[in-house]
Amino acid sequence: MALAYDFSGVYQNLSDEASRALSELGVTSADADALSALSFENVMAALSKMAGNGMTAPLKGLITMTAVLLLCSMLTAYQNSLTESGETVQTVAVLCLSGAVAVPAVGFIGTAGDVIAQCANLFLAYIPIMAVMLAASGRAVSSASYQALTVAAGQGVMRVSSDMILPLLHIFLGIAVSSGIAPQVGLGGFLSLITKLTKWLLGFVMAVFTAVLSLRQAASGALDSLGSRAARFALSSFVPVVGGALSEAYKTVQGSLHVLRSGLGIFVILALAFTFLPVLLQGLGWSLCLFAGKALAEALGVSHCAKLLEALGTVFSTLTAVLLCVPAVMLIAAAAAFAIGGEA
């Protein structure tokens, strides 16, 4: 039975860039007939354009990093005659690198927070649609539990990411720059603490989400005649590791992922892709450029700069993990709804 869903709330919560990209592809609804006209070449062209735009800032940063490191290396070669100013050279280099990378990192953290907030709004806009689909398929119990528990669990992941992990990364960034300027202070312990704390926070909230999802499936499955797959998932979904949590979530809903090829599923994927891919690709670009900059700094023997670039790389890699987990939460929730309600 074909159902008409109200997507006005979803469109209103899409970013301007995502709305423009979807409009250029001709995606204005979740109608299967309209989406069938979507060409692979157009999608790849849009993704290539995103990748190019995302790599512009990281490549500029890499050029600046290379220039600063080469200049610092040349000045360090005269360290015997500039003994008193040897530390000054490295300090100036760290400050230059901070301006080239740390300042964009602050802006990137803010952008990531905005994208997560947009995803949270998209998530809330999708919940009534999913609940209607479940109710229309005759799964009244699943519809009620899906709307209540999935909202709480999914919003919990996004709120922890934006309100706890991102502020911790701001603190980490400040300590990393301070440690690079004054390495004798010994702030490495604080950097290690914040790194572990952010990873465990992210792992914990993802584990809670998969646990709630699995328990909801096990409970509603007893009433809605679901298979035993959700019950098996409930036994192995409490490991506080992001990769493990996502893996277990995938195992639970992998049988229903084929349903995402329906009109509603494709629209979910496209909306998430064009919301997250621009910032995600930029984060990956910064991570790669910082890795290359760190390798160059080590080759040139500029140890202070290498440590700073490594710390900054940790910021971007952590942000990348967050930006992967948040859309995964929404995609998994959608797949779970499809598993119960069937194709819309």
Where are these regions (language model features)?
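Gly/Ser-rich, low-complexity
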Residues: 1-90, 103-114, 118-119, 123, ...
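Membrane interface segments of multi-pass transport proteins and intramembrane proteases
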Residues: 80-84, 183-198, 297-306
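Mid-bilayer segments of alpha-helical transmembrane spans in multi-pass integral membrane proteins
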Residues: 95-104, 123-140, 160-168, 172, ...
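Loop-centered beta-sheet repeat module
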Residues: 150-211
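Interfacial loop-to-transmembrane junctions
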Residues: 300-320
